[in-house]
From Swiss-Prot:
<keyword id="KW-0648">Protein biosynthesis</keyword>
<dbReference type="InterPro" id="IPR044145">
    <property type="entry name" value="IF2_II"/>
</dbReference>
<dbReference type="InterPro" id="IPR027417">
    <property type="entry name" value="P-loop_NTPase"/>
</dbReference>
<dbReference type="InterPro" id="IPR036925">
    <property type="entry name" value="TIF_IF2_dom3_sf"/>
</dbReference>
<dbReference type="GO" id="GO:0009274">
    <property type="term" value="C:peptidoglycan-based cell wall"/>
</dbReference>
<feature type="binding site">
    <location>
        <begin position="405"/>
        <end position="412"/>
    </location>
    <ligand>
        <name>GTP</name>
    </ligand>
</feature>
<keyword id="KW-0963">Cytoplasm</keyword>
<dbReference type="InterPro" id="IPR015760">
    <property type="entry name" value="TIF_IF2"/>
</dbReference>
<dbReference type="InterPro" id="IPR009000">
    <property type="entry name" value="Transl_B-barrel_sf"/>
</dbReference>
<feature type="region of interest" description="G4">
    <location>
        <begin position="509"/>
        <end position="512"/>
    </location>
</feature>
<feature type="region of interest" description="G5">
    <location>
        <begin position="545"/>
        <end position="547"/>
    </location>
</feature>
<dbReference type="InterPro" id="IPR053905">
    <property type="entry name" value="EF-G-like_DII"/>
</dbReference>
<keyword id="KW-0396">Initiation factor</keyword>
<feature type="compositionally biased region" description="Low complexity">
    <location>
        <begin position="89"/>
        <end position="112"/>
    </location>
</feature>
<feature type="region of interest" description="G3">
    <location>
        <begin position="455"/>
        <end position="458"/>
    </location>
</feature>
<feature type="compositionally biased region" description="Gly residues">
    <location>
        <begin position="215"/>
        <end position="271"/>
    </location>
</feature>
<dbReference type="Pfam" id="PF00009">
    <property type="entry name" value="GTP_EFTU"/>
</dbReference>
Length: 900
């Protein structure tokens, strides 16, 4: 290459080294070059050539080069080449040049001879040719650096070399290069290049058979320098005798860089025919792994050794691929070929993960939510469910009693009688919609004892809530109506209590009604393992009348006696509080409010608490009477204010040291919950079902909003359990606690969904947006009405119904009392019209307080009017006493309409 500016890769090609080595040498010289395509100045290029040429010391006369890093590397490569050839990678008759093409080098002794040895030729063995060169071979002349493209037949590294081609004559030397047979200055006398076609000293006999092509044009001496990363050969090692080629120009001794030998593409550099040398260890390993890998769906996947892979429920293929160090795209393609359409980030069901793992010889273990949550807490050095300390730290706590039974058998009436309060009338339809927890004081043998009661719904839709109540309780009171007998939910309550290993006290209610037969109830319950004490069993039966208050004290005494006899109710009050969230709802003024039951430890105001995927700091605690509580001891139910979001009903709560820890635990639980929900609710589409999936199907999308988390969960479980035809699909795309917002309406509009509001109403702008977007919002206050209508809608068996037409809204500004008409509400009509005798409902913070009211009287100033329009004040009566300033009255009328 002519002197002057040159690019780095051109210099590397000229010097016979890689661009990376040239860049490293330039960096050592203080020249910082950016890339291999950068240009260097002429002085820099000259110094670089001198550096590569001068770095190779001239071999002493008759003395091999000192062993160093280069000989070790070349020796390893030569050994690898010999092993490959012995294993069948090369032919037994391959020339030493062939071995050199496979990446091998001449094997030299690692020791330096003390005295020069006479040049002798060693005849090669026809069985196992040695890849080394004759030690007496003379080096060839060093031509001027430049680029020379040899003929096809002149490439000693080409596998297509003809065996019977005559040995070509060596090319004539170019001007400026040493002539053949003339030693370079500083070179050893025995390093003359071999004569074409001749042997050294005539000591090498001709090889039988066809003549071989010449050896690789090797460099006299060391070949490439150590810095160049080339193969190392001792001094005096050149081309094999009889090859007709001179050794590789350049290299050691003279210090001038040699040119590339062989055709373009030799030594792994670009150009020429593709290299067909020895595979690297990495390539061999990859080929071996691919041969061993199992084929699943036409795709080669990693092969396991029976290892156990732990995956969370709802994990994706990306999560699985990370565990086994595989490509997620390969897993996706394998499932696609097997008829399963799943993306890499999509949650996958347990069966699919286990099947895919078994095909690859992996034991996939889907971690249960309980185990996963326990591992999560252990990562923060936390534990749940055990009392800290020893026996001396445990103190007696009140029993937690759950009232269970069939719907309308009198559970809430019994609790009313015990609490001396009337909470039954607040439930729509007289049916308990959510769980309530209360603590009452009972006199027993002159001492005051505390009992905590949990009221659970009896309707069939609340199975999950009854199961949670059984898990959080110590004793179960089974209420059975004496005139009705054992019903399906009665049997279910028995199963929940027995599954939780909870003692049962049976309260035979309504003994004051006609047709009551307590003896019949005892006989029926005997079939389910509840044998009365009078029959020789261990279950206490108490005949009561919740309405008349008969034998209530006897029932309380039976509860305490059962607790003292069968249970060891003790807890450590000196540890961080732990317990369970009984219910939770969103209050407009106070934010998320959760009713929690402290099971162990002491809960205090200011504690950092986490419950499920909600966290926060306890800002305020309120008991069942609305009074503030500073400290909550074990078995104490309180309302906790301070959560950042609404906890789920039945979620475990515990106190942690810092808000940061609570937030991290809640975030991880939230992500796990989303994945599990996506894996459970998403229906997979297989290739066999693709044709039917592309057809138009009847799908009902729902958005559920309720006043508390337990009710929303129960409603969703009941709706998803409706059995309909396969052509009709029910899908819940969102659920939440609180009023219906604009976000819910926008989601419903985008997904063609119907919004179900349970004991909640839509906000003002949300109603307008729903009307504008054509989104249907349906309101319910009794759960079985919602279930029945949704089921009828899915089955297409709906009869003509009455559609609600909203008339207007009015805000209560003042209250007046009258001896004639009772409580009068002074209102300002904010929208629409208020009409006399119209239906109305009372809202407080968008929560339905009263339903099915009627505007009995309506006055404007002192005149009786039939309606009052938007922007005017009026006075009206509803026939309902529990109204407050700030409440909203919503008037509506029912219009009969045919369903589509």
């Amino acid at each position: 290459m002519a002197a002057g500016k040159a690019r780095v890769h051109e210099l590397a090609k000229e010097l016979g080294v890689t661009s990376k080595e040239v860049l490293a040498r330039l960096s050592e010289q203080g020249e910082f070059v950016k890339s291999a395509s950068s240009t260097v100045e002429a002085p820099v290029a000259r110094r670089l050539r001198e550096s590569f040429g001068g770095s190779k010391p001239a071999p002493a006369k008759g003395t091999a080069k000192s062993p160093g890093k280069g000989p070790d590397k070349s020796l390893d490569k030569a050994l690898d080449a010999a092993i490959d050839m012995a294993a069948g990678n090369g032919k037994a008759t391959a020339a030493p040049a062939k071995a050199a093409d496979s990446g091998g080098a001449a094997i030299v002794s690692p020791t330096t001879p003390a005295a020069p040895e006479p040049p002798t030729a060693v005849p090669p063995s026809p069985q196992a040719p040695h890849p080394g060169m004759a030690p007496g071979a003379r080096p060839g002349p060093v031509p001027k650096p430049g680029i020379r493209t040899p003929r096809v037949g002149n490439n000693p590294f080409s596998s297509a070399q003809p065996a019977d081609r005559p040995i070509p004559r060596p090319p004539a030397p170019r001007p400026g290069t040493a002539r053949p047979g003339v030693p370079r200055p500083g070179a050893s006398p025995g390093s003359m290049p071999p004569r074409p076609g001749g042997a050294v000293g005539g000591a090498r006999p001709p090889r039988p058979g066809a003549p071989r092509p010449g050896g690789r044009p090797g460099a006299p001496g060391a070949g490439r320098s150590d810095a160049g990363g080339g193969n190392y050969r001792g001094g005096g090692v050149g081309a094999a005798p009889g090859t007709g080629f001179r050794g590789r120009p350049g290299g050691g001794g003279g210090g001038r860089p040699g040119q590339r030998g062989g055709a373009a593409g030799a030594f792994g550099r670009p150009g020429g025919a593709p290299r067909r040398g020895r595979k690297s260890k990495r390539q061999k390993r990859q080929e071996y792994d691919s041969m061993q890998a199992p084929v699943v769906g036409g795709v080669r996947l990693p092969h396991g050794n029976g290892e156990t892979i732990r995956l969370a429920r709802g994990a994706s293929l990306s999560d699985f691929a990370d565990k086994i160090d595989a490509n997620p795209a390969a897993l996706v393609q394998a499932l696609f070929n097997l008829g399963e359409m799943v993306t890499a980030t999509q949650s996958v069901g347990d069966e699919t993960l286990e099947l895919l793992g078994s095909e690859m010889n992996y034991n996939v273990q889907v971690v249960s939510p309980e185990d996963e949550d326990r591992e999560l807490l252990e990562s923060f050095d936390l534990s749940y469910g055990e009392d800290e300390g020893g026996e001396e730290d445990l103190q007696v706590r009140p029993p937690v009693v759950t009232v269970m039974g069939h719907v309308d058998h009198g559970k809430t009436r019994l609790l009313d009688t015990i609490r001396k309060a009337n909470v039954r009338e607040a439930e729509a339809g007289g049916i308990t919609q959510h769980i309530g927890a209360y603590q009452v004081a009972v006199d027993l043998d002159g001492s005051q004892r505390l009992i905590t009661f949990i009221d659970t719904p009896g309707h069939e839709a609340f199975t999950a809530m009854r199961a949670r109540g059984a898990k959080a309780t110590d004793i179960a009171i089974l209420v059975v109506a004496a005139d009705d007998g054992v019903m399906p939910q009665t049997v279910e309550a028995i199963n929940h209590a027995q599954a939780a290993d909870v003692p049962i006290v049976v309260a035979v209610n309504k003994i004051d009604k006609e047709g009551a037969d307590p003896a019949k109830i005892r006989g029926q319950l005997t079939e389910y393992g509840l044998v009365p004490e009078e029959f020789g069993g261990d279950t206490m039966f108490v005949d009561i009348s919740a309405k008349q208050g008969t034998n209530i004290e006897a029932l309380e005494e039976a509860v305490l006696l059962t607790a003292d006899a069968a249970l060891d109710l003790r807890a450590n009050p000196d540890m961080e509080a732990q317990g369970v969230a009984i219910e939770a709802h969103l209050d407009r003024g106070r934010g998320p409010v959760a009713t929690v039951l402290v099971q162990r430890g002491t809960l205090r105001v200011g504690d950092s608490v986490v419950a499920g995927d909600a966290y926060g700091r306890v800002r305020r605690m309120v008991d069942e009477h609305g009074e503030d509580v500073e400290v909550a001891l074990p078995s104490r139910p309180v309302q906790v204010i301070g959560f950042t979001s609404v906890p789920g009903a039945g979620d475990n709560f515990l106190v942690v040291d810092e808000d940061r820890i609570a937030r991290q635990i809640a975030d991880r639980r939230s992500a796990r919950k989303r994945n599990a929900l996506a894996a459970r609710s998403r229906k997979r589409i297989s290739l066999e079902d693709l044709d039917s999936a592309l057809k138009e199907t009847s799908q009902l999308n729902l958005i559920l909003k309720g006043d508390n988390a337990g009710t929303v969960e129960a409603l969703e479980e009941a709706l998803m359990g409706i059995q309909v035809d396969d052509e009709v699909v029910l899908r819940v795309i969102d659920r939440g606690v609180g009023g219906i917002t604009e976000t819910n309406v926008n989601l419903a509009s985008a997904s063609d969904a119907v919004i179900i509001g349970f004991n909640v109403r839509a906000e003002g702008k949300a109603t307008e947006l729903a009307s504008r977007e054509g989104v249907e919002i349906r309101y319910y206050s009794v759960i079985y009405q919602a279930i029945d209508e949704i089921e009828q809608a899915l089955r297409g068996l709906l009869k003509p119904i009455y559609e609600e037409n909203q008339l207007g809204r009015a805000e209560i500004r003042a209250l007046f009392r009258s001896s004639k008409v009772g409580l009068i509400a002074g209102c300002l009509v904010t929208s629409g019209v208020m009409r006399r005798n119209a239906k109305a409902r009372l809202l407080r913070d968008n929560i339905v307080v009263a339903e099915n009211l009627s505007i009995a009287s309506l006055r404007r100033e002192k005149d009786d009017v039939t309606e009052v329009r938007d922007g005017f004040e009026c006075g009206l009566t509803l026939g309902y006493a529990d109204i407050k300033e700030g409440d909203v009255i919503e008037s509506y009328e029912l219009v009969q309409k045919e369903r589509a």
